[in-house]
Amino acid sequence: MGIDIKNNTFFLISLGAFLGALFRWQIDEIFIVNLIGCFLLGFFNSLNILKRYKLTLCVGLCGSMTTFSSWMSHLYKLLNQGLYKLFLLNSLSIVLMGVLSIALGHIFAKRLNA
């Protein structure tokens, strides 16, 4: 996959990533920012918009905003502290809530497009 400079896709994704990073910087709670990102990803993926704008929002904004590595670091700390129940609860809840958030974003976008 090459960089699509001709259609400004590279620059649009970079702009989305910049905005996503700023948004992520303002939200300190990993769980919340990941749920918001999942909701937005489901919403944006369901919109009938040009591919380059969808890439801007999904890859740039949502990709930059969500924090898989921060979440893994948080889980590792829970394990090191011996908080096994909290580790398991956190692991399961973010996965289940993330899928639910994507589904809700998808449903919301479809209702707006109807």
Curated annotation (Swiss-Prot):
* InterPro entries, sorted: FluC
Per the UniProt record, which residue ranges are transmembrane? 3-23, 30-50, 55-75, 87-107
UniProt topology in membrane: Multi-pass membrane protein
GO BP annotations, alphabetical order: cellular detoxification of fluoride
Where is Na(+) bound in this sequence?
A: G63, T66
Q: Does the keyword Cell inner membrane apply?
A: yes
User: Keyword Kinase, does the record have it?
Assistant: no
A GO term from the CC aspect: plasma membrane
Concerning HAMAP family, the annotation shows: FluC
Free-text function comment from the UniProt entry = Fluoride-specific ion channel. Important for reducing fluoride concentration in the cell, thus reducing its toxicity.
Q: What is this protein called?
A: Fluoride-specific ion channel FluC 1
What gene is it encoded by? fluC1
